[in-house]
Amino acid sequence: MMILDRRVHIDLAAGKPLRIDLGSGGAGRGDYYGIDFVDLPGVAIQADLNEPLASLPDNSVGALRSSHCLEHISGFIALMKEVHRIVMPGGQIEITVPHFSNPYGYSDPTHVRFFGLYTFNYFVETSRQPARKVPTFYTDTRFDVGSIHISLMKRTLVNKVLYPTLRKNLNSSFVTQERWERTLCWSAPADEITYGMTPVK
């Protein structure tokens, strides 16, 4: 792991909470420091996300986001443990990944996992999980999942017909999301799913 942008060192020395973008590529998104494996323009920290984020101290991050990155990470549970370590109590986490119903997700040979409605509930205390309970014994890392938003693919014929109705109702509650994932997701597939979370410490 190598910090390329001196402003990261300055903010850390001043105790200013960082805002980081995991797997940013060269996008350079606003006031977020980009972290990526490749030293591209806009990347502030070069790191292999399958390795510990050793240069970032505990509780040094106030906001973390990641878009279409985690599906490429083989050490997913270990990375989430690192995310938990570096994000401060009350820090905001936003993760966007392809939903498992996205047919294009299976074509990419660099994708090593798929995500659904319940994926991050494996990091949530059983008593705080909605609906179907999932095991939590794989890790002691805990998060609260405050929001989940499913974005439908607009390119399919079924979605073009159903999209206006589904868009209004799909994300109105976890119950409607679960019903869609259980019964409709293969007919009306999603493009991506976004989770809003905070670490539990």
Locations of regions flagged by a protein language model:
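Residue-level marker of positions within ordered structural domains that often coincide
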Residues: M1, A27, E125
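Class I SAM-dependent methyltransferase Rossmann-like catalytic core
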Residues: M1-H9
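S-adenosyl-L-methionine-dependent methyltransferase catalytic module, highlighting the catalytic core
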Residues: I77-A78, M88, Q92-K201
